[in-house]
Amino acid sequence: DEYGNATKVGVADWQDLIYQDGFSQEYNISVSGGSRNGSWHSFSGNYLKQQGIIKESGFTRYSIRANMGRKIKSWLDMGVNISFSHTDTDFSRTNSNDYGVIRSALVFPTTYDPSDDETLNSDELSWLASNPYAYINSAKDNLKSNNVFTSSYLEIKLFPFLKFRQNLGINYTNRERGTYYGRRTSEGSEANNINGKAG
């Protein structure tokens, strides 16, 4: 108030507000078979989703694989393997020596009300730590990755004791990472003359 006395004091458990119970689920499916003419095949798929113990963090992956082969002659085999995987990772800002959501939750005063917009939008403690809520709600660090692998083989039986096998494989990986820090985080703070930061 006008006399310098606190008119509103919150009681914030910042660690409780940034942490959550981690949750993981995984599913697998596979099908395989063959025929009398010497051909065979197998197909499989996998889905994995992990929720991080810090809110807004997690990992998702799905993958598929196909293997096919055939005995062309009694002395000749050939086959092909194909796999594809996609991963999506949401990182939390925990690898900073000076700032980061974990350090901020440990040192940010508990007398601030996390439900008050003035707390979220305040710069007066930027020298100490960023508001933990700011890292949860306005900081993003996402990595998407795609991987394709194909291989084929040709195997020739030259003698009962000797085989020749040729393998050919191609591996392709694509990664895309994007980061954004809102202006209430140390990385994107107005104190650093930055109104948000993207990368």
Predicted regions and their residues:
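Surface-exposed loop/interface segments of Gram-negative outer-membrane beta-barrel transport/assembly proteins
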Residues: D1-V11, G38, G52-F59, S63-F149, ...
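An active-site-proximal structural segment forming one wall of the substrate-binding cleft
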Residues: L162
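Catalytic cores of large soluble enzymes that bind and process phosphate-bearing ligands
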Residues: Y19, F23, K140-N146, T150, ...
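A generic beta-sheet turn/junction motif
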Residues: G33-G38, Y47
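Short strand-turn segments of transmembrane beta-barrel domains in outer membranes
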Residues: E2-S30, G45-I54
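Outer-membrane beta-barrel channels and translocator barrels
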Residues: S24, R36-N37, K73, K157-F159
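Residues on the lipid-exposed face of transmembrane beta-strands in outer-membrane beta-barrel proteins
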Residues: I29-G33, I64-R70, T150-I156
